[in-house]
Structures are given as structure tokens and as C-alpha cells.
Amino acid sequence: MLTAIVGVNWGDEGKGRMVDLLSERCDIVVRYQGGNNAGHTVVNDKGKFILNLMPSGILRDGTVNVLGPGMVIDLEHLCGEAERLRQGGISVTPETLKISDKATICMPYHKLLDCLEEDRLAGKKFGRSEEHTSELQSQFHLV
């Protein structure tokens, strides 16, 4: 069986919570697009976990999790998130987390360009997060 959770409200509609609830019955959980500008908190018997890049299935033993081709991955953030999960007793290994070779990697200069754009706007922000991946995401048509 295939279950898809698709947001149509530009975020903040509870997709992460639904994935957490439904992932109990899944062998594979795929996050197909986005970056660490999104996030949700999961509280379970292992503790409280804040997820930005990781699919919610990472909290389930025996579940394979995939960061898909539409993902924008900030490696520094991903490594930090993985380490926090490991400290909480969650297994983050090559067996539990797969990364598409078509995912986009956020480089330090992308963040710098995003900060420079904010400066150019002279404080007139237009709703982006402080993760500084907007510049990179604007360069690609992610599908």
C-alpha cells in the first residue's frame, strides 16, 4: 500500500504530525522535497525530537527513510540533526537514512547569497526562514 501526504497550504498544516502517525505502518518513509526551513516536533516514548530535514519515520525502528530528489540539504544542519537524534537513542545509519543522488546540496555560499539578499532588501523580509536556503531554492525548479 502507498500512502501520500501532500500539503496544499504552503506549510503549517500538520504534514509532519500525519507522517508521524501513519509511519507506524510503513517500511519506507520518503520526504520528496523541501529543506530544513520546515520543521515539526514529535514527542514519543523515547523523548522529544525536533525534525527539520529528517523524515518522521526516522523515529521508528526498522523503517528506511529517504531524502528524495527534491530535497535541499544543508549538510551541516543534517549532521547536527542526526547527532541530536543519536543522543536521544535514535539510530541514524546508512541503513536507516538514504539520500537521493539527485538531492541538491546547500553550500555555504548559498547561505551567504541569501544573507546578502536580505541586506539588499534593507529589512523588508518577505517571509523566508532564517535557514538561508531561499537563494538556493530560487535557482532550481524542484520537482
Model segments located where?
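Single conserved hydrophobic/aromatic residue that forms the stacking wall/gate
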Residues: 131-143
